[in-house]
Amino acid sequence: MPQDMNYSTDNTRIIDRKKVPAPYELINKLPIDNEISRLVYGTRQEISQILHQKDDRLLVVVGPCSIHDPDSALEYARKLIEQNINYKEELLIVMRVYFEKPRTTVGWKGLINDPDLNETYNIGKGVEMARKLLIDLAKLNLPAGTEFLYPISPQYITDIISWGAIGELQKAKFIES
């Protein structure tokens, strides 16, 4: 081996790099207003009351396995809103809005990780799409729930989430981080 040659030994398997906005940058770009804050805060309080059996309604978190198309999600949301109105005395309906795929080792990784469904992994675009969809749902007066898979994801969207879950398979990831 030549003595004067530079050998690259760092990040030898990285093909591409894309900028991911810092959470505060995206929150400043897509802020929530007082009405959305009121919806999220109020729904969190209602969920707490239901879980502590101080509210007789049933909490229903319902929606698709994962979101891949915001327009379809909004169409689904409009149907849920009708049910939320019809059953408001018996149910508190929260739309399940999962953006990441926890059990997928191959294939699509979810809207946040691969918003274009083509393995380009434009995470910056994905977190922006996720945040915008949540704002649109809140403007429809529909609370949203999601599963948090990685410690960074909540930093972008937790202010618009009324109900959150950490899946059984994901606990170790939070501990390791």
Which ranges hold each PLM region?
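Residue-level signal for pocket-adjacent positions within structured domains
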Residues: G42, V62, R103
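Long, contiguous hydrophobic alpha-helical segments, chiefly transmembrane helices and signal peptides
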Residues: I47, V61-P64, Y76, A144-G145
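Glycine-rich anion/phosphate-binding loops
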Residues: I67-Y87, T120-K132
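A short helix-to-beta-strand connector/capping loop
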Residues: D55-D56, E89
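Short glycine-rich or small-residue beta-strand-to-loop segments that form or flank ligand, phosphate
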Residues: R57-H68, V94-Y98
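N- or domain-start disorder-to-order transition segments that initiate the globular core
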Residues: D10-K54
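N-terminal beta-rich core of secreted/periplasmic extracellular enzymes
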Residues: I36-Q49, I81-V94, E100, A130, ...
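Active-site-facing alpha/beta catalytic cores
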Residues: P2-N11, E90-S177
